[in-house]
From Swiss-Prot:
GO terms for molecular function: ATP binding; ATP hydrolysis activity; ATP-dependent DNA damage sensor activity; endonuclease activity; mismatched DNA binding; ribosomal large subunit binding; rRNA binding. Residues 716-791 form the Smr domain. It comes from the Bacteria. It comes from Thermomicrobium roseum (strain ATCC 27502 / DSM 5159 / P-2). Belongs to the DNA mismatch repair MutS family. MutS2 subfamily. Homodimer. Binds to stalled ribosomes, contacting rRNA. It is an enzyme of class 3 (hydrolase). Its EC number is 3.1.-.-, 3.6.4.-. ATP binds at G344, P345, N346, T347, G348, G349, K350, T351. This is Endonuclease MutS2.
Length: 792
């Protein structure tokens, strides 16, 4: 997208925020180069990468790419044949070791490629070069020094060099002791790369040798004694041999690096891509941002065949404003209307609202999470057109109005139904009557095109036009006449009101002047303001009712879940009781069959005492017969039931089961308890499915108990609490939730630095009432909410 568009919507500042969160210099470069893409598949991929990075940092908060270095110039120098310095070679080794460390970290998790498939691509791109890594590690030390292990020749030279050095120093120390009267000071130093001793100028003949230097006073000569000449020569020769061997080693290592140039540059780019993904995740944490949904096109298509795209932003905030004070806005485009016309006072937030939508669209299409509430989403826009502010084109000597018109002309020529158009103060800077007419004509053309858009204006004529025109919707920024300041709330569905007279009165303008102003306004404007005020009052009432309805819905959902759990538990106990009865009956029948066989054998065989066995068997058989017949009578009663208090029944009209708690003969109704609720149903619509408890106990079945559950909200908020207080509240809450029979709960801890989230996860890991837990989905709170499944 055009750089001018990115600048107007301040996307360049988002780039800087992202670059500041990179740990690798190459990643910082990439952060300053990121741009939105219009390829929907690419946007989905970029968001998936950010999602995986956010999950990785949530699970491993201290994760980092480590010691990656920018080795691009080093590799390129090696390709040109320049012999690399040891310190440069070391940067290559550091990068290879950092890449190897990353591979080990990821592969420590057997399912890493399944859990982080997108990040795994970056890690797999960091090709392992074990041979090169081993050669470099053997040759170059952590401070950039060439090690003795670089080659056997270098090790041998350095051993000889050490011995020669020690012999040389030992001989010089002896000379100092032997020639004390000629020595200026008892020390050894170096001149011209050779060891010398300080000799007094007046005793020069006492120390035969070569003078390499003279002190500033002329009193001291620095002499290389002839006695150490060969030792000095040997030491210098070995130094030269060491230098040649080091140069040879560096030449070999340089060639090895040049040969692996493609792989090394690939490692650099893979490391930068991984660090950039982590930076996007860190930015999401800091902005309290969520992953945006990619909304599919909906609705009819315009003649050109372009689908209608959508915007759905809930509690959206401008990412460059302080999130603690920024007022969130809700904006939806593309469902009920295509273009939102925002009116309101200056500095009231109209431009901020427009910029927020545009900037969040750019962020989403660059793979960034957006500062908004879960459930927010946008379509992918191939083109976004923006005209913001009253900047002038000095080079072309254009007026403010002309500058705006040039942008609008380009927009109308290029935009289509897949475009997002954002026009700030449409057609401003000219005669108000002509400007209003021009603005209306532009809006009509945008509707014909089918573009999605937001337009801000001061023209009151556009309020009326938007009210009665399909595809347009009014919106305003709220103004507090008491404080004489905007609240920055965006009120969709309400055109903006004029507050000039209220402000003037509160500032002390004489009442007669205000009254005269009202006369000059005529009746239309005040009536419109009163109508808008009434609409605002009704909107606030509707919002209050909607909030109450949402609370009731959540409570009802909680009660429904609890009732379902209770009914399921009762049904399970009923099935278990019935199975127990059947097992008892089967055992009795088996016993009866065995007794019958014993009687039959006794009757045929004289070996059995016929009278005694037969009488005992008959008595046992009679007992079994009595118990089985009793069970049979019970079964027949179930088939033709007479309903009584305590019976387990099914409400055939509702498909629910419950226990009879009262019978009302006068109305022929039965009162049934289902969980905590009681309902009355006609007796004809109730079917007895299980005997009352006294009868169950007679047929060996345990009673089915129903416990009243306490009401517990399915969500607890711990944001802003200290860890110790939060864990104490959470522990007590989990106990209540389990006793209430909640299968799961939501723990809202916020994102922040992640400290509270980590402490909560550690606490849940060993909690006896917790079956499992997981982070909420990206559209249900993401990293700021943990869903806990309970042992119920």
């Amino acid at each position: 997208m055009a750089s001018e568009l990115l600048r107007l919507l301040e996307f360049d500042k988002i780039r800087e925020l992202l670059a500041a969160r990179c740990q690798y210099s190459v990643a910082s470069e990439r952060a300053r180069e990121i741009a939105p893409t219009a390829d929907r598949d690419q946007v989905a991929y970029l968001l998936r990468v950010t999602r995986e990075a956010a999950r990785l940092l949530n699970e491993r908060p201290s994760f980092t790419i480590g010691g990656f270095r920018d080795i691009r110039s080093v590799v390129q120098a090696a390709q040109r044949g320049n012999i690399l310095a040891p310190a440069d070679v070391r940067t290559v080794l550091d990068t290879l070791e950092a890449a190897a460390s990353l591979r080990r970290q990821f592969m420590a998790d057997e399912r890493w490629s399944e859990r982080y498939p997108a990040l795994a691509e970056f890690v797999l791109a960091m090709v392992d070069l074990p041979g090169l890594r081993a050669d470099l590690a053997r040759s170059i030390g952590p401070r950039g020094e060439v090690l003795d292990t670089a080659s056997p020749e270098l090790a041998a030279i350095r051993r000889s060099l050490k011995e020669a050095h020690e012999r040389l120093l030992e001989r010089l120390r002896r000379l100092l002791a032997e020639r004390q009267e000629a020595i200026q000071d008892a020390y050894v130093t170096i001149r011209d790369g050779r060891y010398v001793i300080p000799v007094r100028a007046d005793r020069r003949q006492a120390v035969p040798g070569i003078t390499h230097d003279v002190s500033g006073s002329g009193q001291t000569l620095f002499v290389e004694p002839f006695e150490v000449l060969e030792l000095n020569n040997r030491w210098r020769e070995l130094q030269a041999a060491e230098t040649r061997e080091i140069e040879r080693i560096l030449r070999v290592l340089t060639q090895r690096i040049a040969d692996a140039a493609d792989e090394l540059l690939q490692i650099v780019e893979a490391g930068a891509a991984l660090d950039l993904a982590l930076a996007k995740a860190r930015l999401a944490y800091d902005l309290d941002a969520v992953e945006p949904e990619l909304l599919e096109p909906s609705g009819p298509t315009v003649p050109e065949g372009h689908p209608f795209l959508r915007v759905r932003l809930r509690a959206a905030r401008h990412p460059l404003l302080d999130r603690r004070t920024a007022v969130p806005i809700d904006v939806e485009l593309g469902e009920r209307f295509r273009i939102l016309v925002i009116t309101g006072p200056n500095t009231g937030g109209k431009t901020v609202a427009l910029k927020t939508v545009g900037l969040l669209a750019l962020m989403a299409q660059a793979g960034l999470f957006i500062p908004a509430a879960p459930g927010s989403g946008l379509s992918v826009f191939p083109a976004i057109f923006v005209d913001i502010g009253d900047e002038q084109s000095i080079e072309q000597n254009l007026s403010t109005f002309s500058s705006h018109m040039r942008r609008i002309v380009a927009t109308l020529q290029q935009a289509d139904a897949s475009s997002l158009v954002l026009l700030d103060e449409i057609a401003a800077g000219t005669d108000p009557q002509e400007g209003a007419a021009l603005a209306r004509a532009i809006l009509e053309r945008l509707l014909e095109i089918g573009a999605l858009g937001i337009v801000t204006t001061h023209y009151p004529e556009l309020k009326v036009f938007a009210t009665g025109t399909p595809g347009l919707e009014n919106a305003s920024v709220e103004f507090d006449p008491v404080t004489l300041s905007p609240t920055y709330r965006l009120l969709v569905g309400l055109p903006g009101r004029s507050h000039a007279l209220e402000v003037a009165r509160r500032l002390g303008l004489p009442e007669d002047v205000i009254a005269r102003a009202r006369e000059l306004l005529g009746s239309g404007a005040p009536q419109l303001d009163r109508l808008i005020a009434e609409m605002q009052r009704r909107l606030e009432e509707a919002e209050s009712l909607a909030a109450a309805a949402e609370r009731s819905r959540r409570e009802a959902e909680q009660l429904r879940a609890a009732a379902e759990r209770l009914l399921a538990e009762a049904e399970r106990e009923r099935r278990e009781a019935r199975q127990e009865v059947l097992r008892e009956l089967e055992a009795e029948l088996a016993r009866a069959r065995e007794l019958a066989r014993k009687i039959e054998r006794a009757a045929r065989s004289p070996a059995y005492p016929p009278i005694e066995v037969t009488q005992d068997s008959l008595r046992a058989l009679e007992e079994v017969k009595r118990r089985v017949q009793s069970s049979g009578r019970q079964s027949r009663q179930e088939r033709v039931p007479e309903i009584a208090v305590g019976d387990r029944v099914e409400l055939t009209a509702l498909g629910l089961e419950g226990d009879v708690v009262a019978i009302h003969p006068e109305s022929e109704e039965v009162e049934v308890r289902i969980g905590q609720f009681r309902v009355r149903q006609p007796q004809a619509s109730v079917r007895r499915i299980w005997p009352r408890r006294e009868e169950v106990s007679q047929t060996f079945a345990p009673p089915v108990s129903v416990t009243t559950i306490p009401r517990v909200e399915p969500e607890i908020h711990l944001r802003g609490l200290h860890v110790e207080e939060a864990l104490d509240r959470l522990d007590r809450y989990l106990d209540r939730a389990v006793r209430a029979g909640l299968p799961w709960v939501r723990v809202v801890h916020g994102k922040g630095t992640g400290t509270l989230r980590q402490a909560i996860h550690a606490f849940l890991r060993d909690h006896p009432l917790v079956k499992s837990w997981e982070l909420a989905g990206p559209h249900e709170g993401g990293l700021g909410v943990t869903v806990v499944y309970l042992e119920v």
